[in-house]
Amino acid sequence: MHTEKAEGKTVFKLFPAVKKALACILPALLLLSCGCKGTDGSGICTESEKAVSASLKIYCDSYYRSAIERAARSFNSVYPDINIGFAENESVADILIADRMSDESAKNLAALDGFVNTDNFIKELLFLYNGKVIGLPLFLETDGIWLDKLPYLRENADVPCRLDQAVSSDFVKESPMLCGNNESLYWGIIAPLYLSCGGAADDIGSGSLSEAPFRQAAERLGKMAESGILKKNDKPTDAFVSGNTAGILCSYLDIIKIQQDMPLSSKLVFSPGIAAHENESINLIIRADTLFVSEKAEKEAARLFVGELFGDKSILRLISDTHLPSAVKVNCKNHSLPEIFREFYSVLSSTAVKTVYVTDRRNDS
């Protein structure tokens, strides 16, 4: 990574970032059993809505392909004349769900103010451009240190909660925490340190960091590296699954994939405070995988699709199917949630954690 100075700012640039899987998960919408909400308020589709004829192309990663196919089949059972397909690249997509959108690319996106009621969203994560909502947050996304308690129990070692504890832990020094990519390093360590050093959240979202807090954050990151508790590794997942590391720095989406290969006796815990000293606020940065609609998309077809996607029943089904925390406010009390999901929310609701919501507007460079 390197920095460039521009107008009193230090522009933080990563090595060419490997784009995270563009999160695009559309669940089965249960339209046959529940009906759909028509614009006439009757709870059923009007004949004019059913008669809409159009095509919608969605750009997504293969990780979400099967979920989108299920959603398309369910949606088409009610709207047979709206064909949903897949785009080969972002430039030809009508609908895109991504974790990043630069202001330059935002010029080509449609305003979504009238698509759904935005009161149920975390307002800080609504993606605004020129005063209009162009992006609707779907899933919460965060990066941080994940620990498996099992290796600590085997070594009779204490599980660290703060940087001071990690530095003084013989187990962490012998089996350091590993980081595999620059994106997780930026969001999980550098950005929280930048906030602790007096930097602004808006700077983090744009990637344009003020020099003084950035320099302090870089010095603290350097000390973490010198202490040996955090190391870069080409295959951090392999070491974490085998129990040969004290923890792994990765995104929530990545830990869900990793969990599938973990031993049954493993107990995963989320620890965003590893980069924070004692008596210092733990900054947990939350972003969102956000839905965008291209300006060239057929607006009525897109409105119908987006409206069904963000309905309460659909969001609850999304949570159940994907284990991803929702950026839409819904009541999950009567629904069974996976342990890793509860672990994330217990940290999110902790009074010891300062939650900072950020929209990622960085350029790809």
Task: Please annotate each region the language model reported.
Residues H2-E4, G8, F12-L14, K19-I25, ...:
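Conserved N-terminal structural module of periplasmic/extracytoplasmic solute-binding proteins
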Residues D113-D119, C197-Q216, A275-N283:
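Short, solvent-exposed loop/beta-turn-alpha elements that line the ligand-binding surface or hinge
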Residues I122-P160, C179-I204, I285-V293, D364-S365:
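Periplasmic solute-binding protein
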Residues I204-D234, Q259:
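Glycine-centered hinge/linker elements that transmit conformational signals in sensory
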Residues D261-S326:
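Extracytoplasmic/periplasmic substrate-recognition and gating elements
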Residues I319-S365:
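Long, aromatic- and glycine/proline-rich binding clefts that accommodate carbohydrate-like moieties
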